């Protein structure tokens, strides 16, 4: 999740790129791209205006931007811009019916998340391939694998309405209800087919993460006491980790690039790092009283597999939006509505959840945090809504508490808006 609590008066968003080598920062004057190691500014644009979302495509010059000015059409939160920072040119612009809450990219697909819909594009042509109606997802909870071969999308599964009526071609169906259980839907963005429904938790999903190869999915619920890791796409539970005994709001989950460690940040002062040991060991459900089940759809329950791709174009057409809603509604109604008939693939396990391998104690009022692990040095990196970048050394043999080694400001004085004195 890239949007941060606005502790720093000028910081609007902040996130790592797919391999955690760079940081993309959105602020009131525009956006900035920073290198992690060595830390430093790579590119900035202070003429863009307030920018609420900045997403990079690895270390390329392709960047996705979403504005944060409701009263300025040129910088609207409904407008997505794809820009080339090297050429300083705009590749394309798309207007959406509601505010864009998140953008995800890999080398094959671009994903745009609205509160009730997810749009899937071919990133090479910006052709709209498919739209999924998700039901209310105001926190834009989703994850896209950075792998081109396993380009999987995970998002909270909508709960089917008990009073659902057959879909009429003459009317736009009501949106599916908001997710009230901890089911996760796994979707293949290449074949445009639903792969699995995972009963990950019994309370709503708060955070999701896919590893770099698209073979593991980490999940956390809004209870925030347990983090689980499942294999993808067969959805077998591999690990279960204890974050704490008290509830917490999970801010971020990230695997390292080797998929040997998993880092989790929350609204507590502790960041947890878990070791994904070779002995893949599940755990007794700490926030669930029943067995988790991984469920696979039958061919008759995956209508998207036979649906032809949708045409590209601007999305401000009422008729086009109506068509997208009618087509994508089948995912929530037919596929998710039939999960009760799927066979369970796993049984309850008897081990207690594993504790963390290493941890970071944050000082002071840290606000919202995003955590990631360096691919080049044994360090855990933390960016915060205070406008700080911090790097902590981690002992990969013994674990324990990580030590702070570096700290830098994400915004320079030239990035500050009027009346701001910085950090």
From Swiss-Prot:
The PI(3,5)P2 regulatory complex regulates both the synthesis and turnover of phosphatidylinositol 3,5-bisphosphate (PtdIns(3,5)P2). Necessary for proper vacuole morphology. Plays an important role in osmotically-induced vacuole fragmentation. Required for cytoplasm to vacuole transport (Cvt) vesicle formation, pexophagy and starvation-induced autophagy. Involved in correct ATG9 trafficking to the pre-autophagosomal structure. Might also be involved in premeiotic DNA replication. Pfam families: PROPPIN. Its main location: membrane. InterPro entries: PROPPIN, WD40/YVTN_repeat-like_dom_sf, WD40_repeat_dom_sf, WD40_rpt. This is Autophagy-related protein 18. Component of the PI(3,5)P2 regulatory complex. Belongs to the WD repeat PROPPIN family. A motif (L/FRRG motif) lies at residues 241-245. It comes from Cryptococcus neoformans var. neoformans serotype D (strain JEC21 / ATCC MYA-565). One of its GO terms (molecular function) is protein-macromolecule adaptor activity. It is found in: Preautophagosomal structure membrane; Vacuole membrane; Endosome membrane. Residues 282-295 have a biased composition (Basic and acidic residues). WD repeats lie at residues 200-240, 245-284. GO terms for biological process: autophagy of mitochondrion; glycophagy; nucleophagy; pexophagy; protein localization to phagophore assembly site; protein transport. Keywords: Autophagy, Endosome, Membrane, Protein transport, Repeat, Transport, Vacuole, WD repeat. One of its GO terms (cellular component) is cytosol. The N-terminus might form a beta-propeller domain involved in specific binding to phosphatidylinositol 3,5-bisphosphate (PIP2), leading to the association of the protein to the membrane. PANTHER family: WD-REPEAT PROTEIN INTERACTING WITH PHOSPHOINOSIDES WIPI -RELATED. It is a peripheral membrane protein. Residues 281-317 are annotated as: Disordered.
